[in-house]
Design a protein with these regions (language model features):
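Non-heme Fe(II)/2-oxoglutarate
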Residues: 1-71
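A short, polar/charged loop/turn motif at coil->beta-strand junctions and beta-hairpin connectors
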Residues: 4-7, 76, 154
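Short linear sequence motifs
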Residues: 43-46, 78, 87, 155
Length: 166
């Protein structure tokens, strides 16, 4: 495994996708959410979410070799989960289920900075702001992660989830 990830539980990946592609994916997802009247998310009240939107599944599979390279171990794609956060939303501190062993949170569109916090193995917490197309790859089952109350209007992001191959 990549030593940096092992020592910090995460790695910041600037421009994981081009900002233009991030904006286009956000536009497509927001249109989908509106067209199909996607309702509130169960984990984050007053946000909208959807699992395995086709544009994100394509990205999940396309990026598997790159994620494998960053991690230094072969990964298998499991699923995607996208969420549209609204003013006042927060993501409580948690770890993920086994299908999210290696996860990326990818920023697609925002109107306000909103760091994701990750707890490192030494107990230190680090907050990272992402721009459109930037990602954080982290060990979802090991690293507690969260977001404090969102002060903007809208924040669109997608999680890309993987597991390590045997």
């Amino acid at each position: 495994m990549n030593q940096y990830i092992e020592n910090s539980n995460f790695i910041y990946i600037p421009k994981f996708i081009f900002p233009e592609r991030a904006n286009q994916l956000a536009k497509e997802f927001l249109e989908f959410v509106e067209k199909y009247d996607i309702k509130d998310d169960v984990q984050v009240e007053n946000s909208q979410s959807y699992q395995n939107f086709v544009g994100f599944l394509e990205l999940l599979c396309e990026k598997t070799p790159e994620v494998t390279k960053f991690l230094g171990e072969t990964v298998l794609p499991t699923y995607t989960y996208a969420r549209v956060y609204k003013n006042g939303n927060e993501l409580t501190r948690h770890t993920d289920r086994h299908a999210c062993e290696v996860s990326l949170t990818l920023q697609l569109k925002k109107d306000h900075d909103w760091p994701i916090y990750i707890k490192k193995p030494n107990g230190e917490s680090v907050g990272i702001d992402l721009d459109s197309g930037d990602a954080i790859m982290y060990l979802g089952c090991e690293a507690e992660h969260w977001r404090e109350k969102f002060e903007g209007t809208e924040y669109v992001q997608v999680f890309l989830h993987y597991v390590r191959s045997r």
